[in-house]
């Protein structure tokens, strides 16, 4: 074989090796499998509510973020187009996305509950802003601006003695007698920083400060745990205090578990990162004290008492605490949770595994957040922008 031919073959081999390595870096099989299972061809996410045929704004918003992390613009376009057309009546500036869509009582299909869920609203706005930035798509930014302005008009309230705060939705969270209800898991610090960067006069940093105060309140959170819901009662025109939500209880469970994940994913340089991790330290104690070393499914924040359930911990709960324990320097606990998630996903997604063995939506969704972060597919910067691994290593989908 001639020297030139040898050199050509070597060069071809190098190109093939680089191409293979890049494919491994740029592909995200976990997202691709998730999309195959839960996302219809038209961009509608199934199984993200109590009924498998219904869709939630939460499911749509999370899938948009996963598509962004996976550099999957085609799916992102479909997800947002379907959401805007079907959940917002094609007018995101006037209509916040109804949180539940499906078959209505009259057998027609459409929005079942027009009340919005602010966590989904914010995830959509965030995904749109970052998609506009990394894919150079101005229309996404225009849509994000309309959505954020709508949120600011309808969901940001000024609370006596606290400041600006985010309501969970337009209806049902402001009550007579000066009572407000909040959901700690609806507020992701990275998003609030990103919105402040985009709209510096809208009060998003004040919302971030109020959320941190809620988590740090020792009267309503004496054991360093996140509750699903928290109440706030005005005591005068200028004062108030956090209380147990009178419409639920002091339980921390399926909503609250996300609060730990968002805290763990916060950029270390953010001035609220360390205080938030400290405010939630009770999860470390509760997890370490369990027989399995896994987070409790249900825990009462006022007493620290764990509800007995034969030691069951959903896979998604372990997934949600990997970044949290890692950020707190509790690497043994983080590794224990990561091992559980890795093992569960490997078994569920094996080619020989039946479809019924795959994780349910909520566990799978939390695992995508956790595994993507652990694999460094994304990181939140101090200004709230997201750093995506594919930006440097992969072809951008324009």
Curated annotation (Swiss-Prot):
Q: Where is the signal peptide?
A: 1-23
Alphabetized UniProt keyword annotations = Carbohydrate metabolism, Cellulose degradation, Glycosidase, Hydrolase, Polysaccharide degradation, Secreted, Signal
| Catalyzed reaction equations | Endohydrolysis of (1->4)-beta-D-glucosidic linkages in cellulose, lichenin and cereal beta-D-glucans
* Intracellular or extracellular location(s): Secreted
Pathway(s):
Glycan metabolism; bacterial cellulose biosynthesis
Task: Give the UniProt entry's GO cellular component terms.
Answer: extracellular region
Q: Which PROSITE patterns match?
A: GLYCOSYL_HYDROL_F8
MF terms from GO for this chain are: cellulase activity
Tell me a GO biological process for this protein. cellulose catabolic process
Active site: residue positions: 58, 119
Recorded family membership = Belongs to the glycosyl hydrolase 8 (cellulase D) family.
The name this protein carries in UniProt is Endoglucanase
Q: Which species is the source of this protein?
A: Pseudomonas fluorescens (strain SBW25)
- What lineage, starting at the top, does this entry show? Bacteria, Pseudomonadati, Pseudomonadota, Gammaproteobacteria, Pseudomonadales
């Amino acid at each position: 074989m001639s020297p030139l031919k040898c050199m050509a073959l070597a060069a071809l081999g190098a190109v093939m090796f680089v191409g293979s390595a890049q494919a491994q870096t740029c592909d995200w099989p976990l997202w691709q499998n998730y999309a195959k299972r839960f996302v219809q061809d038209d961009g509608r996410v199934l199984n993200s509510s109590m009924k498998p045929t219904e869709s939630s704004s939460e499911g749509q918003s999370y899938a948009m973020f996963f598509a962004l992390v996976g550099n999957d613009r085609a799916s992102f376009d479909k997800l947002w187009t379907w959401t805007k057309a079907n959940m917002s009546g094609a007018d995101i500036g006037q209509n916040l996305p109804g949180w539940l869509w499906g078959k209505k009582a009259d057998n027609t299909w459409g929005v079942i509950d027009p009340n919005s869920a602010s966590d989904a609203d914010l995830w959509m706005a965030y995904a749109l802003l970052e998609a506009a930035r990394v894919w150079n798509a101005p229309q996404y930014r225009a849509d994000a601006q309309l959505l954020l302005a709508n949120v600011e008009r309808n969901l940001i309230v000024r609370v006596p003695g606290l400041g600006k705060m985010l309501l969970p939705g337009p209806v049902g969270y402001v009550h007579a007698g000066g009572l407000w209800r909040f959901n700690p898991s609806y507020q992701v610090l990275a998003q609030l920083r990103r919105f402040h960067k985009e709209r510096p006069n809208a009060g998003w940093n004040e919302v971030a400060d109020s959320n941190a105060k809620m988590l740090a309140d020792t009267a309503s959170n004496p054991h360093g745990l996140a509750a699903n819901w928290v109440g706030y009662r005005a005591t005068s025109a200028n004062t108030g205090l956090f209380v147990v939500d009178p419409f639920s209880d002091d339980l921390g469970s399926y909503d609250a578990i996300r609060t730990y994940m968002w805290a763990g994913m916060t950029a270390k340089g953010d001035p609220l990162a360390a205080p938030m991790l400290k405010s939630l330290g009770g999860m470390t104690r509760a997890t370490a004290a369990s027989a399995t070393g896994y987070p409790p499914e249900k825990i009462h924040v006022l007493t620290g008492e764990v509800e007995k359930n034969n030691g069951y911990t959903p896979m998604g709960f372990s997934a949600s605490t990997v970044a949290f324990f890692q950020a707190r320097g509790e690497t043994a606990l983080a590794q224990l949770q990561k091992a559980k998630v890795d093992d569960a996903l490997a078994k569920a997604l094996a080619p020989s595994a039946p479809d019924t063995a795959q994780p349910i939506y909520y566990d799978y969704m939390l695992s995508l957040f956790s595994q993507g972060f652990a694999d460094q597919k994304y990181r939140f910067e101090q200004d709230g922008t997201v750093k995506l691994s594919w930006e440097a290593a992969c072809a951008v989908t324009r």
